[in-house]
């Protein structure tokens, strides 16, 4: 899994990284990969196009991100038998409007999945220890994790209205 930066990175930069990593055709980029010690291309299955674009990934509106996503994915070339599974940035938690807008603007010809961002730590980012917590924090974390089921159900319902054949996946 590689995630490309659509907030401050360029389409060309993304396209060249994909070629560098996955192509076996002789080119300046594949020659550079060989000089860097990797003769064979990597198998890259999952490609995230943007990350948390509603927040730290660019503070984008869903309509704007959908347009940006479509432009970037146009240049996500498959090299040497490597097929990229293109993942669009999905919503933060219960932002169902984000999913609605993505599904209105994207289809299975240009996206393979939409991801869902949900963090179950009730005091994140202050939570640093995986073992130093009290019972109250434990139960709050379990309650937050239980909310995942509702999120998956509701986002899936939106996706299924636009994609009844379920060609577009939901990635958690």
Where are each of the predicted segments found?
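Glycine- and acidic
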Residues: 1-5, 51-59, 131-143
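Active-site-proximal beta-strand/loop segments in catalytic clefts of secreted hydrolases
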Residues: 3-7, 49-52, 89-92, 116-119
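Short, solvent-exposed loop/turn and secondary-structure capping segments
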Residues: 4-5, 12-16, 28-32, 57-62, ...
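Carboxylate/His-rich catalytic cores and anion/metal-binding grooves
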Residues: 4-25, 82, 108-109, 113
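Aromatic-rich carbohydrate-recognition surfaces in CAZymes
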Residues: 10, 49, 65
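Alpha-helical scaffolding within the catalytic cores
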Residues: 24-39, 94-106
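Active-site groove signature of glycoside hydrolases
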Residues: 27-61, 117-126, 165-172
